From Swiss-Prot:
Inhibited by EDTA. Residues 515-772 are annotated as: Not required for activity on soluble substrates. It comes from Flavonifractor plautii. This is A type blood N-acetyl-alpha-D-galactosamine deacetylase. Keywords: Glycosidase, Hydrolase, Metal-binding, Signal.
Amino acid sequence: MRNRRKAVSLLTGLLVTAQLFPTAALAADSSESALNKAPGYQDFPAYYSDSAHADDQVTHPDVVVLEEPWNGYRYWAVYTPNVMRISIYENPSIVASSDGVHWVEPEGLSNPIEPQPPSTRYHNCDADMVYNAEYDAMMAYWNWADDQGGGVGAEVRLRISYDGVHWGVPVTYDEMTRVWSKPTSDAERQVADGEDDFITAIASPDRYDMLSPTIVYDDFRDVFILWANNTGDVGYQNGQANFVEMRYSDDGITWGEPVRVNGFLGLDENGQQLAPWHQDVQYVPDLKEFVCISQCFAGRNPDGSVLHLTTSKDGVNWEQVGTKPLLSPGPDGSWDDFQIYRSSFYYEPGSSAGDGTMRVWYSALQKDTNNKMVADSSGNLTIQAKSEDDRIWRIGYAENSFVEMMRVLLDDPGYTTPALVSGNSLMLSAETTSLPTGDVMKLETSFAPVDTSDQVVKYTSSDPDVATVDEFGTITGVSVGSARIMAETREGLSDDLEIAVVENPYTLIPQSNMTATATSVYGGTTEGPASNVLDGNVRTIWHTNYAPKDELPQSITVSFDQPYTVGRFVYTPRQNGTNGIISEYELYAIHQDGSKDLVASGSDWALDAKDKTVSFAPVEAVGLELKAIAGAGGFGTAAELNVYAYGPIEPAPVYVPVDDRDASLVFTGAWNSDSNGSFYEGTARYTNEIGASVEFTFVGTAIRWYGQNDVNFGAAEVYVDGVLAGEVNVYGPAAAQQLLFEADGLAYGKHTIRIVCVSPVVDFDYFSYVGE
């Protein structure tokens, strides 16, 4: 087990004996505002020089506060300069402070730590930082995006520093294995800090689905946790479709798949739903909760956004605190009068649990500033805004006691911090204790009493070679055997569950063995076609038509390349937004004769991005039809559809064609040659003679005869191994390469097929047989 790290960017171990600002200097009355603002902004330097923009405009602060100074300073901040109209200056920069008020660039540091992108097509933004105590290093993250649609998407990037001056890739980092080995000497406490010396922690094909990453380290579970705002490939105008996801990592470099969190934000004072834009999350041991300040908004974009407070006992399930904002824009003419932006905080413990102080560094914008005189950090109008300064970006400070803050947010003058609730028991349960190999199952974890304060759970497996369990409590069956899944909390509650891993009776049918059709489609490419559900890409979707709108119910059908005995169906909803996620459904098995039977139905699918798995009694089918009875917004969508056969999949038989010109064919009687591009290999034969025949001997298990139908044609008898197997009527509308006869399921061995004309005309194009 690795050494445990001390408090990193949880920012909860700080012991401060005096406020950073005297109470008289803080501008707001706590009876009206949850936080008291300092009268001016703080001076954060910006590296750029631009004749169209005022100097030192900055945003996206993230502040790390340590118990003891690190390389001379207890306060370290990562942030980005920013100006209106262009994003090329929005590159992560570093400052440090001894008091959280006066910020300096450490001697020898050259900002920004990440160079300006080569063109306006790309931009950096949304910085965050965490202290790694085990390695005694700072880890600075930021978001990078290719703003060109159809480009390479986005990345969460990382630079690391041992001294706060040189930021880059540690010399002990192996790029091939993505392993950062712990340095054991001063010579190893070095980084390569060139222009391209960064680590890509996460990459995505979408441009804006990992905005404002905020990272903490959990010393109890020995994991890093990242939350980010998913706005898909849209960004600023994605509106209420935004949502927050979280991931885990053992080392802060390689991250797991994201899981969407629940209830991150609620309603504002006007009853409108809030959507996230930027966030800062920390775990506060004093409260035994994850706490987040979220820059959020009601409406279509973040203009005029505010801060709200939201909390969680486990990091997954959240609850907004009241409906009042934590921080709002100031009065007209103030430096923060337009919009509160990405902000950072720490909770300073008080003399007792819940009696601490909330300290917030917040970025904000001042509006309508073009060519006007604007205030400096002391409040004096000494700065000339420039021609493209539609708004000015600054970073300021606000604070309040935690209790007073909560009294305002909850509109409860008598609020006191509730006492922490000790748990009596932790209980694990699962829908079954028998898990097939390759399958996953989510544990249910409950507490008594239900309001137990400490609900951060560490899961472990007694035998990861049999079954693994991740930080979300999701078990994966690895191999046949038995494993005990254990759960525990910081305060010592625990439980375990024995899981038997058995052979998996289901086999995934490859999507390449299926085709998809739908009763309604929108005419887009990444949003619309039924084929999108079989492309292996959850970011492309089938969508019912909405221009004009086709009312539900509507269906999407997957057809198989051969009959399968199927017993499981998986519906993967769209991953960005909820519009069209199916909530009520019917599932039909389609048989070879075209009939269909209902095999499953339901009306309780959640409007989230999680897979919906349906198991049903095994049935032989040539396809499955998913009928959307109800869906969000009255539409139907699907990102992916997958079907599982019950039992092993027999490979599709391989048919070998035998053309009419093949020397192994034996023709008797009069046969005429015919040429046409619609025939197999361009040729066929036909006979007008009753009794004329064609014969073929093969070794295999199945045989097919292909030829023409025509309104002037008659009939033939087909013999297999000398026994009449059927009479075939070839009369019908003219059509080439028609399957006229099929015999399958033959015992493997030598067989002979013979076609005899009994009523002219009879056509022969080719045989096709299954050999070895």
